[in-house]
């Protein structure tokens, strides 16, 4: 054995405590979760687990019938809807040869 101990017993209280509030077998930068029946243990506080969707979510009509194609999920100031999703008449793009459509308009000096 070497003369130096790998763990200094005089500083033992700084490295280990029996209080569950302060002791964790994991590194402090990780988060340890444990699931016990209907509760989730996080930081010593038990939070009841809830389903992400209610049991009758397939019977609700607003998931499909009231869908607004103009809704992007973003704030109006952040983005606008794409042309495919806009309602109303489509805008006509100018032709590549914009002078060919005007035959009667002749300019005279």
Curated annotation (Swiss-Prot):
Residues 62-109 are annotated as: Disordered. One of its GO terms (cellular component) is mitochondrion. GO terms for biological process: regulation of cellular respiration. InterPro entries: TAR1. Keywords: Mitochondrion. It is found in: Mitochondrion. The keyword Mitochondrion applies. May be involved in mtDNA stability or mitochondrial gene expression regulation at the post-transcriptional level. This is Protein TAR1. It comes from Kluyveromyces lactis (strain ATCC 8585 / CBS 2359 / DSM 70799 / NBRC 1267 / NRRL Y-1140 / WM37).
């Amino acid at each position: 054995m070497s003369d130096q101990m790998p763990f200094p017993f005089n500083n033992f209280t700084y490295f280990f405590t029996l209080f569950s509030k302060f002791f964790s077998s994991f590194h402090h930068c990780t988060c340890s979760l444990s699931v016990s029946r209907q509760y989730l243990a996080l930081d010593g506080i038990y939070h009841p687990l809830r389903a992400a969707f209610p049991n009758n979510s397939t019977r609700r009509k607003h998931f499909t019938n009231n869908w607004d194609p103009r809704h992007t999920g973003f704030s109006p100031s952040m983005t606008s809807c794409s042309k495919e999703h806009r309602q109303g008449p489509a805008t006509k793009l100018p032709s590549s040869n914009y002078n060919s459509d005007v035959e009667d308009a002749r300019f005279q000096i």
